[in-house]
Amino acid sequence: MGNNGAAFKAWLDAYGQAWENRNPEAATALFIENGTYQVTPFLEPMCGRKAIFEYWSEVARTEENIQFGYEILVANAELSIARWSASFVIVLPGLQTQLDGIFLISLDDAGRCKSLQEWWHKQEK
């Protein structure tokens, strides 16, 4: 498949569905076995599906009413970039949250993520 615009769009669509449906299994399946996921540049990347599953299991427990959107900025074989946004309610204390960020993603030939780095800003109400 390689990473082109269509492959990257399919990956982002699946990522959004996994998040909106609060499905850690689906989110984890988007990554290769030893994939990395760096939530912010200040944290060490999570390495491997087990760590990614644990992260997304926590997301599924603590967020609801999730909406995800994106705009592809660059998609090529080495690295793809998207601007993304999400809104959700943090279950306790019921805090409405909006995120706006950038993904840097490297996909393998099967369209699974080898590495994901995020930069984002948060607004809470």
Predicted regions and their residues:
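A beta-strand edge to alpha-helix "cap/lid" segment located at domain peripheries
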Residues: 2-7, 53-125
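A short gly/proline-enriched turn/hairpin at secondary-structure junctions
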Residues: 36-47, 58-60, 119
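Short, low-complexity N-terminal intrinsically disordered segments enriched in polar/charged residues
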Residues: 1-33
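Secondary-structure boundary/capping signal
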Residues: 23, 35, 64-67
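Short hydrophobic/aromatic segments of transmembrane alpha-helices and their interfaces
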Residues: 34-35, 96
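Structured beta->alpha junctions
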Residues: 16, 41, 72-74
